[in-house]
Amino acid sequence: MIQVTLIQIDNYGPWTVTPGPRAEPDLQTLQSRLYGDLEREFGAHGAIVFFNRFDNLIAISNGMDYDDHLLIQQSIRNRYPITISMGVGTADTAYEAQKIATKMIQNGGGAQSANRCEVLNIDSLADDDNSLVQIAHIDINDITNTLTDIETAFDTSIKVYEVLLALMDELAKIGGMCFFIGGDNYMAPTNGISKDQLREALKVVDKKTGVTLKAGIGVAKQAGRAADLADIGLEDIRAELVDDSVLLFNDLDEY
């Protein structure tokens, strides 16, 4: 089971314009700092946070319980002018788990509700016996020579985000999610998706976007370790140690 935590800034839209519109550089700084702090605090528990939309962040939080989440909420309250609410859900696939986590937050009130503050609603937690995280680290083949060094920076970004949208769409169809993590890199929680299914999804995106993708996959009890294994797999593909576009490393013998 994969455990997903949705993190949402409380009443953020109204706060940004109260008592008047706040300076945009200050808001961007707040969002980036908040993401960095959440990544560090969740990461201390072996989890990973994806910035998603910055005011709505998604964490793969296997191994974390109610108290772990509560302490992070309190830490943010003590250091920021805003508060955060969280919803937690588990499921066989990442897409289904985030649906449950979203419902948990929505049950506590709307995103712009002045009455919602530090909601922490947990549908279920993945225990050690059934905790499993599968993460794919995906990148574009030779982006330096095909895009970065020959196209403008903005045109390269258009292509990178075109690939992201195609990956999000294809992986969601089979129960996965996908997030941009910088450069030409994407990270995808892919519980329940086989190597063959992922390989086929990458081929579909290749055809749609005109790039060539490859992916390392990691399987472990927690997201941090799964991502590390995925990184190793991707590095082996880059080094041409294997003749495949997808390589999986697994910490769990029973998987």
From Swiss-Prot:
The gene is gch3. GO terms for biological process: biosynthetic process. It comes from Methanosphaera stadtmanae (strain ATCC 43021 / DSM 3091 / JCM 11832 / MCB-3). Catalyzes the formation of 2-amino-5-formylamino-6-ribofuranosylamino-4(3H)-pyrimidinone ribonucleotide monophosphate and inorganic phosphate from GTP. Also has an independent pyrophosphate phosphohydrolase activity. Belongs to the archaeal-type GTP cyclohydrolase family. InterPro entries: GTP_CycHdrlase_3, Nucleotide_cyclase, Rev_trsase/Diguanyl_cyclase. It catalyses: GTP + 3 H2O = 2-amino-5-formylamino-6-(5-phospho-D-ribosylamino)pyrimidin-4(3H)-one + 2 phosphate + 2 H(+). It comes from the Archaea. This is GTP cyclohydrolase III. It is an enzyme of class 3 (hydrolase). Its EC number is 3.5.4.29. GO terms for molecular function: GTP binding; GTP cyclohydrolase IIa activity. It holds the Pfam family GCH_III. Keywords: GTP-binding, Hydrolase, Nucleotide-binding. The keyword Nucleotide-binding applies.
